[in-house]
Amino acid sequence: MISDKQLKYQKALYYEIFNKEEYWFLKEDILSAKIIFDIWGHVGYFSEWCRKYNKDAEIYFFEPVKSSFNQAKETLWNDDKIKLFNYWISNKSEKSTLLLNQDKSMQSSKFSSFLNPNWIPEKVNFITLKEIVGSNHINSIDVVKIDIEWMEFEVLNNLEQTIWGKINTLAIEVHILNDELENQWKILSQKLQSEFPKNNIIQSPYTDKILLSYSTRT
């Protein structure tokens, strides 16, 4: 059962994706994409938004929180081109603890911060991009969207070069919540500059601690 608070924040997320079109800068990439990775898909809004612009792309949807995953399944189950994974992308495959923000599940994380101060533990499955790509025999990923609540550094700063080479366009919600994460962002930013000829930064309208990073080879 979805609480009133959860419903409120889900409506806000829906508004950001469909009305404000927070990911407007990905439209051209999505239109021509054959494979899209929605890494932390929450209840499925970004995947639905992608489907609005591309009816044929194969979408890999990742959501670790069981309640959110089940809600997404109710919406996306009849689309046979969306592959649903009840996993969190990490730098190693394991079963571990997620710090769940019950009201705003999209602000849950492996780590604690002001975004999830009153977390409760939930055991979830973690898996690497390398394992997903290998087990599904994927040679190229046209669009990767990552919003994994300041675990982006743990994943991307440890990502194998073979996987970097398969990503054509990458959109990351970057969380610079402290000095250590700022240092991690500097490392990741240098990697993005070396991998992709086109890079752009969009500042969050809500806080200077969060930004959207867009990188593409096209």
Q: Where in this protein do the model-derived segments appear?
A:
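Phosphate/nucleotide-binding beta-alpha loop and adjacent structural elements of enzyme active sites
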Residues: 1-218
